[in-house]
Amino acid sequence: MPLSSKVSQAPWSLTGKTAVVTGGSRGIGRAIAIHLARKGVRKLAITYVRDLASAESALEEIRKEGIETGIAIQADILNASVGRDLIAQALVGLETSTIDILVNNAALLDPINTPSVEDVTLENFQELMQANCFAPVSIINACMPHLPPSGGRVINISSVASKTPNPGTIVTYGASKAALDSYTRSMAGLFAKDKTATFNTVCVGPTVTDSFRAVSQLYPGEFIKEVAKSFTAADRVGVPEDIAYIVGFLASEEGRWMNGACVSANGGLREALPALS
């Protein structure tokens, strides 16, 4: 069955859809989950690792948008069985056999405790690759049989670090995101036709999240202002809602002709390194 060319009367709407957003308890994931609910998603699962209070707070906001069912699932992207376990719990908790939208947002970035590239160990390398590439791929594989007959959406949150030179402690993180970009493109080529689904990544630039704040601690001065001036054409750093709006577009019928893409979400990236020098 080819990707539909039928014109929708409300291509922006996600009314009645079911979605899973990993890492949806805070930051970008939280903003994505809330935005999907506002666009009409009916059933929504978010994941968290340890902070149940943040997950419950996110669900409270999501339910204010009129969602029918919202659940939080504890899931660790360093767990080898995260894909199988998460999707099984989501299907049961949401009382559904279909997941229309999968957003892989959860990621591992710990520049304070990650060794620089010249000191990287196999353990460090494997941990980042497992969290940022294997985990989302395994979640996609577990979700694949439960995508709808047409119009499924798989959206992976990546980073500009996958495409730029990076400071020493972020090199392996960038490599793990580049691997995810590659997997996403290949999945679009391999499965888009049979699944009539789209597979895209959103390459996020500097955005004010917990991870961004952690990175900022490594550098002196007014880091965020320097990033805004040196990294982006806009005079500010991104906020989670900036990313959520792009994901909402890709998840809707409006984004149906984008497949295998890495969508830049960076406010007009200038240079990768000047703010860090």
From Swiss-Prot:
The gene is penD. InterPro entries: NAD(P)-bd_dom_sf, Sc_DH/Rdtase_CS, SDR_fam. NADP(+) binds at I28, D76, N105, Y173, K177, T209. This is Short chain dehydrogenase penD. Short chain dehydrogenase; part of the gene cluster that mediates the biosynthesis of penigequinolones, potent insecticidal alkaloids that contain a highly modified 10-carbon prenyl group. The first stage is catalyzed by the nonribosomal peptide synthetase penN that condenses anthranilic acid and O-methyl-L-tyrosine to produce 4'-methoxycyclopeptin. 4'-methoxycyclopeptin is then converted to 4'-methoxydehydrocyclopeptin by the ketoglutarate-dependent dioxygenase penM through dehydrogenation to form a double bond between C-alpha and C-beta of the O-methyltyrosine side chain. GO terms for biological process: secondary metabolite biosynthetic process. Keywords: NADP, Oxidoreductase. GO terms for molecular function: oxidoreductase activity, acting on CH-OH group of donors. The active site is at S158, S159, Y173, K177. The lineage of its organism: Eukaryota, Fungi, Dikarya, Ascomycota, Pezizomycotina.
